[in-house]
Amino acid sequence: MGFDVLLDQVGGMGRFQICLIAFFCITNILLFPNIVLENFTAFTPSHRCWVPLLDNDTVSDNDTGTLSKDDLLRISIPLDSNLRPQKCQRFIHPQWQLLHLNGTFPNTNEPDTEPCVDGWVYDRSSFLSTIVTEWDLVCESQSLKSMVQSLFMAGSLLGGLIYGHLSDRVGRKIICKLCFLQLAISNTCAAFAPTFLVYCILRFLAGFSTMTILGNTFILSLEWTLPRSRSMTIMVLLCSYSVGQMLLGGLAFAIQDWHILQLTVSTPIIVLFLSSWKMVESARWLIINNQLDEGLKELRRVAHINGKKNTEETLTTELVRSTMKKELDAVRIKTSIFSLFRAPKLRMRVFGLCFVRFAITVPFYGLILNLQHLGSNVSLFQILCGAVTFTARCVSLLTLNHMGRRISQILFTFPVGLFILVNTFLPQEMQILRVVLATLGIGSVSAASNSASVHHNELVPTILRSTVAGINAVSGRTGAALAPLLMTLMAYSPHLPWISYGVFPILAVPVILLLPETRDLPLPNTIQDVENDRKDSRNIKQEDTCMKVTQF
C-alpha cells in the first residue's frame, strides 16, 4: 500500500521503531499485572469461624483447662466431608462430648450449628492481608470476589468500545495519555479504598483504561512497521506480557500486604504518564485523516531518528499526496461504525474476529484468574505461567512466519480445549498431571492469543482499525468478564466452569478457517482495500514472484 512505500523510505525497522517498541514493552510489563492483580490482592486463604474458646483473648486457661488447640477446635467447629473444619459453620454451644468419641454420632443427635456470626479467622501464612480478609468476602459473600474481577473486565469492555472509537476520531496519542492518567489515579486510590464499593468502582475505572492502553500499543506498533517485521513486533509485545506476569509473581512473593502490593503496581504508571508526552502519533492515521502536514512532520522526525537524512529532505506534501492518492481519495467518503455493516467482506471479518476473540479470551482469563484452583503456591505458579507463556509466544512466531496466520491459530487453539477438558475430569490426587495440563493449556492459549492478535490487526483497515479493535475488544472483554462469573457455576457442579472453558476454543476452529490469510500482505488502509482483497492479494503475489525472479 502507499504508506508502506513512505515508511520504507524513512526506515521500516530502525532506531525509532526499536525505541518505540522498547517503550511499549516497558508499558506492557508494568500494566499487565493490573489485569491479574486479584490473583493476589483477592487471594482467599484458609479460614474458619471465630469462636470464643479459641479466639477470645479474655478467655483464660482456667476456662479451657489443659485442652489443646486441636481439641478446642473439635468441640467448636463441625467437620466437613473431608474431615476438615468447616469454613462457614460453627457449633452454637461447645460439644464437650466429642472429646470422648472416636467417630461420629448419629444424625438424630447432631448438634445445632450457626453461620459465622462473629466473623472469621484467616490463615495469614501466605498473605498478611487481602481484600478477602479485609471485607470478609467468604461464605455467603464469596461471589463478590468474582464480581470484582468481572467489574474490571466490564470496565475494559466499555473502555475499548468508547476509547477505541475516540482513538480513530482524535488520535491514538491523546487517548493513551488520558488513559495513563486515569489508570494512575484510579489504581493508586484503590489501595486506600475505605469500603468494598469504592474499591469496586476504582477497579472498574482502572479496567476502563488498562486495555485501551494495551490495545493502542499494538496499533501504534503495527502502523509504524512494515509487513515483514509485523509478526516479530507483535511477538515481542506479547512476550512483554509474560514478563509482566513473572514480575507480579515475584512482587507478590515478596509483598504480602495487598495495600502495598497495589501501590507497588500502581505508582510506576505515573512515570509512564509523564513519559507518554514524548510519544509520536501514527503518521498513517494522520495522513488517512487528511492531516498531511502533521503526518509529514512525524515522517520527517522518524527519518531523522533512523538516520535517513536524504529522505528527510526529499519528503514533501506532494510526494505524500501522490504516493497515497488512492487511500486519500477513498477516505473522502465519510466513514463511521455503520460503514462496517455496508461492506459485506469487512462485516463478515468483524463477526468472525469477534467470535474468535471471545472464544480464546474465556479460557485465557478463566485460567490465569483462577490460579488458586490450579496450584497451592500461587506466586510460584504465576511465575511458571509467565515463563511458559513467554516460550509459547516465541514458538508462535515461528508458526506465524512459516505456516501462516490461520494454521498457527488452529494449531494452538484446538489443544487448549482438549487440555482443559481432560484436566477437568482428572482426580484431585493426580496433582502433578493436573498442573502439567493446566500449564500446557495456559501456554497454548497464550500462543493462540498471540497468533490471533497478529491476524486480527492485519484484517481491518487503518481508517477503522481502532473502531474495529474496540468492537473486537468488546467481545474479548465480554469473555474476560464472563470467565470469573462462570466460576459461580461450581455451586452446581465443580466441573461446569471448566467444561465451559474447554468448549469455546474448540468451537472457534471452524470460524478461523473462514478468515482470509494475511501473511506477508500489506495492511489495508481503506474499506475498499478490504473489499478488493482478492484482487490486490493476487497482484501482490505476482509482484513478489517477479521480484524473486529478477533476483537471479
From Swiss-Prot:
SUPFAM superfamilies linked to this entry: MFS general substrate transporter
Gene Ontology cellular-component terms listed: plasma membrane
Keywords: Cell membrane, Ion transport, Lipid metabolism, Lipid transport, Membrane, Steroid metabolism, Transmembrane, Transmembrane helix, Transport
Biological process per Gene Ontology, one example term: monoatomic ion transport
Activation and inhibition: Transport is chloride sensitive and transtimulated by glutaric acid. Transport is inhibited by anionic compounds from different chemical classes.
Entry's transmembrane regions: 16-36, 146-166, 178-200, 204-226, 234-254, 260-280, 350-370, 380-400, 407-427, 435-455, 474-492, 496-516
Keyword Translocase assigned: no
Family: Belongs to the major facilitator (TC 2.A.1) superfamily. Organic cation transporter (TC 2.A.1.19) family.
Protein name: Steroid transmembrane transporter SLC22A24
UniProt source species: Homo sapiens (Human)
Taxonomic lineage of the native organism: Eukaryota, Metazoa, Chordata, Craniata, Vertebrata
